[in-house]
Amino acid sequence: MTKNKNVIEVEGKVVECLRSAMFTVELENGHQVLAHISGKIRKNYIKIMLEDRVLVELPPYDLTRGRIVFRYRN
């Protein structure tokens, strides 16, 4: 999904919607991260709701924050 090779891509589920397009995402391994939506999702008006499965990019230096880059169809 990404051109940057320094990120970790992991699947998760949205468990909480916060303000300013921020979400709490529970990853497959049970950890919870704070994630914001990427520019392409924002530009194309893709809605992210509770219980949606998403793909999150995590930077290697801070594994508590991430960016939602893809929403899977349910």
Swiss-Prot record:
One of its GO terms (molecular function) is ribosome binding. Residues 1-73 form the S1-like domain. Pfam families: eIF-1a (PF01176). The keyword Protein biosynthesis applies. It is found in: Cytoplasm. It comes from the Bacteria. NCBIfam families: infA. Component of the 30S ribosomal translation pre-initiation complex which assembles on the 30S ribosome in the order IF-2 and IF-3, IF-1 and N-formylmethionyl-tRNA(fMet); mRNA recruitment can occur at any time during PIC assembly. PANTHER family: TRANSLATION INITIATION FACTOR IF-1, CHLOROPLASTIC. This is Translation initiation factor IF-1 2. The gene is infA2.
